[in-house]
């Protein structure tokens, strides 16, 4: 008995588009390349019209009764669809959770650096996880860590909103910030 192959070596079956002779419906509602309705025509007549114009007959909506076809240049149509999909992929930004770690006894300059990092992450559209790490007996001072995280939230309130308030998680205290959809406008009390 020969050994079985480890994976399927056959080429994947690609679904071919319903164009020209691959359309099997006898009656079709045909739309011109300009968007003008040509009415319900039998398939052979629609193919003849498309061939005269040196264009393709493309099935647009299979579920309609009768199915809707459009006379167009399929190569150009396919190129436009790929271009739109590429643009959509480029515009969609996967939001990540970036982490900013610190101790509750943090120096002013180090705190400013963490604020700068968090601001950069928020401007790029990512969520920020602010973590205060406790070592040894420091965990007794969790109220100081909570104060620090709330101060950080107030310093970043123009760019972010608190998604999760400060809470203890093991030997850490965490808080989540997410970027604001619209910038916060500060009111001057004078």
From Swiss-Prot:
GO biological process: one example: ribosome disassembly
Cellular compartment(s): Cytoplasm
Keyword terms: Cytoplasm, Initiation factor, Protein biosynthesis
Region (Disordered): 159-190
SUPFAM superfamilies on file: Translation initiation factor IF3, C-terminal domain, Translation initiation factor IF3, N-terminal domain
Family annotation (Gene3D superfamilies): Translation initiation factor 3 (IF-3), C-terminal domain (3.30.110.10), Translation initiation factor 3 (IF-3), N-terminal domain (3.10.20.80)
Primary localisation category: cytoplasm
Cystine connections: none
Pfam families (alphabetical): IF3_C, IF3_N
GO cellular component, one term: cytosol
Superkingdom of origin organism: Bacteria
GO molecular function: ribosome binding; translation initiation factor activity
Subunit: Monomer.
Function: IF-3 binds to the 30S ribosomal subunit and shifts the equilibrium between 70S ribosomes and their 50S and 30S subunits in favor of the free subunits, thus enhancing the availability of 30S subunits on which protein synthesis initiation begins.
Family the UniProt entry places it in: Belongs to the IF-3 family.
NCBIfam families: infC
Protein name: Translation initiation factor IF-3
Organism whose genome encodes this protein: Prochlorococcus marinus (strain MIT 9215)
Gene: infC
């Amino acid at each position: 008995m020969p050994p079985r192959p480890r994976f399927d070596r056959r080429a994947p079956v690609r679904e071919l588009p319903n164009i020209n002779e691959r359309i099997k419906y006898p009656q079709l509602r045909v739309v011109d390349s300009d968007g003008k309705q040509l009415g319900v025509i039998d398939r052979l007549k629609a193919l003849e019209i498309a061939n005269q114009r040196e264009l393709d007959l493309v099935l647009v909506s299979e579920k309609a009764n009768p199915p809707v076809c459009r006379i167009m240049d399929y190569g150009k149509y396919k190129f436009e669809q790929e271009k739109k999909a590429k643009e959509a992929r480029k515009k969609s930004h996967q939001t990540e959770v970036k982490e900013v770690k610190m101790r509750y006894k943090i120096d002013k300059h180090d705190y400013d650096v963490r604020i700068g990092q968090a601001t950069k992450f928020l401007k790029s559209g990512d969520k920020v996880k602010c973590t205060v790490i406790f070592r040894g007996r420091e965990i007794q001072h969790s109220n100081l860590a909570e104060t620090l995280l709330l101060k950080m939230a107030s310093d970043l309130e123009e760019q972010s909103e608190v998604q999760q308030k400060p809470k203890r998680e093991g030997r850490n205290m965490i808080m989540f910030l997410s970027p604001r959809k619209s910038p916060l406008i500060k009111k001057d009390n004078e």
